[in-house]
Structures are given as C-alpha cells and as structure tokens.
Amino acid sequence: VGFKAGVKDYKLTYYTPEYNPKDTDILAAFRVTPQPGVPAEEAGAAVAAESSTGTWTTVWTDGLTSLDRYKGRCYDIEPVAGEESQFIAYVAYPLDLFEEGSVTNMFTSIVGNVFGFKALXXLRLEDLRIPPAYSKTFQGPPHGIQVERDKLNKYGRPLLGCTIKPKLGLSAKNYGRAVYECLRGGLDFTKDDENVNSQPFMRWRDRFLFCAEAIYKAQAETGEIKGHYLNATAGTCEEMMKRAIFARELGVPIVMHDYLTGGFTANTSLARYCRDNGLLLHIHRAMHAVIDRQKNHGMHFRVLAKALRMSGGDHIHAGTVVGKLEGERDITLGFVDLLRDDFVEKDRSRGIYFTQDWVSLPGVIPVASGGIHVWHMPALTEIFGDDSVLQFGGGTLGHPWGNAPGAVANRVALEACVQARNEGRDLAREGNEIIRSAAKWSPELAAACEVWKEIKFEFPAMDTL
C-alpha cells in the first residue's frame, strides 16, 4: 500500500514556515484561539488543512492528486500582544482552489467548516489578500465612484441621504410623500429601510411607483438629480430581478440590496444587471454584526467589505466613527480605504494585514449612517471626505418642523462644512463654531441645533495620526 492509514498531525503537511507566498495566492490572516494543550503550529496547520484539501484522516485518493499544488499552507504564526491564548496564523491558498468570479465559493472554502473545528476554541478571519489574478475574474461594483458622480452631476462634497422612518407601517402614498419632502429640502438620496421589502401594509410595486413620482417632482423643483434607494431584496432571486427590472422601467437611478441576508450569489447577479442597465446599487449590511461583532470569532467587517467590492455594489454602510474611540476610528478608515482606493498599503495599526492592489476595480462609496445629526457634520466631513454618503434618518425626520426643513438643515450644515474646509479651516477644532455661524442665517438649521444640542468631539485633529 502506498500510504499509511490513520489519523495524522496536520503540521507535518500543512505547516510550512519556509514557504514564500506566490503573487497569485489568496492570503488569509486568522486570529486563532486553540483549545488548551493544542500547540500553535498544529492549530494553524489545522486551519490551513480544513479550509483547503485536508480531512481528518489519510485517504488513499490523496495519491491521485498533487497535494503540493492544491493544499493551503500555514506559512507564518505571530503572537497577539496582550493575549496569551491567541495568535495570528497566516495561510496561503493556491488560486486553483476557487471558482472564478464567485465570492460564494471563496467563502465556502475559507470560512466554511473550519469554523466549527473542535481543536479550536474560537477562530476569526481578520483579513484577506485578494490577488489581481482573482479580482480580475469579478466585475466588481456596477459603476464606481467617478461614474456615479458623473451620472448624478454632483462634485466636491459628500452626498446626503436619509432613511425613511417609521420604517414599517406607512402606506405607499404617505411613504412617497415623505421621500418627496426630503428630496425637495435638499437631500440627494432617500432610502428604503433594509426591512422594507414587500409587506402587507405596503407592497413593493406601489412603493416603487410613488417613490418614482416623488423623485421626478423633486427633480423638477430643485433642478438637481435625485434618487431613492428602492430595496429590491426579495425571497427569491427571480423576484429580486423582477423588482430591479421594474425600477429600471420607471427610469430611477438607483436600487438597493441587503447583501448578507440576500446572499452573495443573488448580489452578484443583481450587480451585473445594474451594470448592464445603468442602475446604481446601494448595499446595506444587515446581519453583519452577527458575523463581525465578536472580537475572537467570526470575520472582521473589512473582509465582508472586500467581498462586497468583488461581488458588486456602489454604496455600502460602513459605520459612523463619530464619538467612538480613536483606535476604532483608524480601523474604520482602514476598511473605508479598502473600499475606495485602488492600492492600499499594509498597515497593522489600521487593521490592514496585507497590501491590497485592486488593479482598477471600481471603488465603493462608504455610507455613514446611524444616530448622527447636524452637530456631527464637521466631524463626518473631516473623517470621510468627499467620497461618502452621510445618511441622517432621525437626524432629518426628527426635525421639529418636519422633513423638508430637516433636509434643509442638513444641506446647509454640509455646505457650510465643505466651504469651511475649502477655506482651510480646521473642522475638528472649529466644528461647533462653523455650525453655529451657519445657523444664524438658516432658521431650519438653528431649530435643528436646538433639538440635538452640541456634541463633544472625543478626538483631536486628524493630523495627529
């Protein structure tokens, strides 16, 4: 017999510290917490094995293939500062293990069964290096940042959005009215809540019609291009495509998808349709915290963000950073760069484990959304820069005078911040002053400032990084 039966140590085959990763390999950084008594090399090798060619015992069919060509390799192990029980395992996967153009297949391998592996107490995928040889098999975002600006004819400032609330319970007619008021007041976009699909109180087709009417009415009155993220997410791919096609027939500029609950297969199909039919695609990340919230198990959001850039989306929600801790801010900006930029250098202080070259794959605009209002505007402008969407749901609709004045307040605050920045003022230090002086000539902004009161900026100026 040409092989020895029985259970074997993974590290004999899958731990290869002398290996030099190839340019075409997909590289992964895992945070591994092994069970007590399992050595780091064995645990790292087990991760490499179980997420590639390995199984728990030797099988005779191993002899029918070239393991050296197809196996994942744990090529480096480094300790985690301050964590005795954890380490980072670096694994290289040969490109041939993955189907071209399929995020679904990539994740099934890399974050599949291995996460239930008994020898590990916990496992977290911190980052992935996607080689150009693989990213080039994806279409990526339907349009990207520059094409979106050209389509909307909006330059030199962040875009403004608003999620329509209450998210569940409005009739289609009243929903459309709320959309119209926000767009008329000065927002660029309004948004279907991620929960809004097609429920008994408001079927999707009625919503699409009334929102389209709102868009065209607001465009005619303001002379600006407007959009509403029509949520095409549905229970089946066929139904999702039907909704996207109807949106295209209405002539609206943008649709929306919940990419994690809807799934990568559905998302990639929708992104391809959007590219072919001139629709922008807004992506919501509902369910991300189930995957990325725990620090020692699951998958960091930067991996989900990279996966979305490959699968396709023009906007994606990326948290707000405002008022959070400094370290968290650097890490958020790290994956914001991974979404927008063409080339991102390795920088462990920002959580970026690998240098990532996207070779001209279009970028994705990060969306800051959740609990923000006019007083946050200077910080948001400073942190996210021009290529972002700032989304104020309650921060628009919660205005004491109604939706349109709420939209006016946000637009005035944004224009004031952009002007101040362009004049060379320091938004981080003078933020409250900029908003206060703008409020003197905008009663809508003054009223908004009253309701939400000034916030404390918990961080110093940007240039101290």
Swiss-Prot record:
Binds 1 Mg(2+) ion per subunit. Its cofactor is Mg(2+). The active site is at K165, H284. It is an enzyme of class 4 (lyase). It holds the Pfam family RuBisCO_large_N. It comes from the Eukaryota. Its EC number is 4.1.1.39. It is found in: Plastid, Chloroplast. The modification N6,N6,N6-trimethyllysine is found at K4. Mg(2+) binds at K191, D193, E194. The record marks K324 as: Transition state stabilizer. One of its GO terms (molecular function) is monooxygenase activity. Substrate binds at N113, T163, K167, R285, H317, S369. Keywords: Calvin cycle, Carbon dioxide fixation, Chloroplast, Disulfide bond, Lyase, Magnesium, Metal-binding, Methylation, Monooxygenase, Oxidoreductase, Photorespiration, Photosynthesis, Plastid. Its main location: plastid. One of its GO terms (cellular component) is chloroplast. It catalyses: 2 (2R)-3-phosphoglycerate + 2 H(+) = D-ribulose 1,5-bisphosphate + CO2 + H2O; D-ribulose 1,5-bisphosphate + O2 = 2-phosphoglycolate + (2R)-3-phosphoglycerate + 2 H(+). The modification N6-carboxylysine is found at K191. The disulfide bond which can form in the large chain dimeric partners within the hexadecamer appears to be associated with oxidative stress and protein turnover. GO terms for biological process: photorespiration; reductive pentose-phosphate cycle. Belongs to the RuBisCO large chain family. Type I subfamily. The basic functional RuBisCO is composed of a large chain homodimer in a 'head-to-tail' conformation. In form I RuBisCO this homodimer is arranged in a barrel-like tetramer with the small subunits forming a tetrameric 'cap' on each end of the 'barrel'. Heterohexadecamer of 8 large chains and 8 small chains; disulfide-linked. The disulfide link is formed within the large subunit homodimers. HAMAP family: RuBisCO_L_type1. RuBisCO catalyzes two reactions: the carboxylation of D-ribulose 1,5-bisphosphate, the primary event in carbon dioxide fixation, as well as the oxidative fragmentation of the pentose substrate in the photorespiration process. Both reactions occur simultaneously and in competition at the same active site. This is Ribulose bisphosphate carboxylase large chain. It comes from Passiflora quadrangularis.
